[in-house]
Amino acid sequence: MNPVAMTSDLTGNARQLCARFAKASLGRALWQLTNTLPAFALLWLLMAWSVLSGWGYGWTLLLALPTAGLYVRLFIIQHDCGHGSYFASRRANQWVGCCLGLITLFPFGYWKKTHAVHHGTSGNLDRREFGDVRTLTVKEYRARSRLGRFFYRCYRSMPVLLGLGPIFQFVIKHRIPFNLPLSWRREWHSVLLNNLTLLLAVVACSLALGWHVVLLVQLPMLLIAGALGVWLFYVQHTFEHAYWLRQKDWDSNQAAVDGSSYYDLPRVLHWLTGNIGYHHIHHLAPRIPNYRLRAAFESSPLLRRAPRLTLRTSLECVRMKLWDEDRGRMVGFPG
C-alpha cells in the first residue's frame, strides 16, 4: 500500500479509533495496579534483604532485572495518567500519577506538560524542544564545528544514551529542570513537591535500612530501568524510514503513523512495557489506555501495516544518527 494512501486512511479512522478504544476501565486499571505495584514492592524489599543478609551482591543485581521491568510498567501507568487515559476520573489520574512519580522519580506535572509537547511536535524539524532524542539533520551536522560534531557523536553513542542518559534524567533534569520556563509555575511546583517528598522518603528509608542499602538497591534498578526506557523511546522514533518534516509540510496524524514504530515484542515484554510497543497507535490516539492498545491494533488491518521492528531488527536503529532531508530517511554518520 502507498504510504501516503495508508496515512490518509488512518487519518480518516482516527476519530473512530479514539471513540471505540479511548475508554477507561476502572476494573482493568485497578487490576493492573494490583498485579504490578505489590510485586514491585516485594522485589524491592527482597533486594534490600539480599544486601542486609549478606547473600552476595550478585543476587541483588539478579533481582534488579525483574524489579526494573516492573518499574517500566509502573512508569507506563504514570504515563497514561498524564494523558488522562488510565482512569475516567481526572482526580484519580492526578493522584495516582503523582504517587507513582515518587517511585519513578519523574515529577508528574512537569513530565505531563513536557510529554504533551512531545506529542504535539514529534517529527517536526522546526519544533525539536522537549521529550525527543536530539536529532540533527545531515546539513546541520556538517555545519557544526569539529568540536560540535564530536559532542554530538558522543551524545548519540549508546554508552552515553543508555548509560549516562538515565543518570542525567534521574539526578539532574527531573530534579533541577533548567530548560523549564519560569512561567510554568504549576510544573515547577510539581518538581519541588516531588523533590521534597523524595528527600523525606530517602531519609526515612536510610534511617530504617541504612543509606548504603538504599543506594545499592536503587542504583542498579534505576540504571537498568532507565536504559530500558531510553531504548524503548529511541526505537519508537529512530528508524530508517521515520518521519521528519519542516513546519510547513508537517502533519500530526502522518507523524503519528509514519514517525512512530510498532515494536513487535514477545508477549511478556509487551506486558512489562505496558503495550507501549504499539506506539504508532498511542501517538494517533493518546487517550487509549495501555490496556486497550493491543485491541486497537488488532481491530484495523491498516494499523498492522505500521513501521514494524522486532528485537533483532531494532538493533539496526543503533546506526541511525542523522536525518537526511534530501533522501527522507535516517542515516549514519558520514565517513
Give the predicted meaning of each segment:
Residues 64-95:
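Long, highly hydrophobic alpha-helical transmembrane signal-anchor segments
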Residues 8-9, 89-91, 270-272:
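Short helix-capping and inter-helix turn/linker motifs at the boundaries of alpha-helical repeat units
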Residues 251-270:
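Cytosolic juxtamembrane regulatory segments of multi-pass membrane proteins
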Residues 1-69, 94, 102-219, 291-335:
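Non-catalytic, topology-defining segments of multipass membrane proteins
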Residues 74-83, 111-123, 232-241, 272-288:
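Histidine-centered catalytic micro-motifs
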Residues 68-78, 107-111, 159-173, 218-248, ...:
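Transmembrane alpha-helical segments that form the membrane-embedded catalytic/substrate-channel core
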Residues 43, 82, 86-87, 244, ...:
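Active-site-flanking alpha-helical
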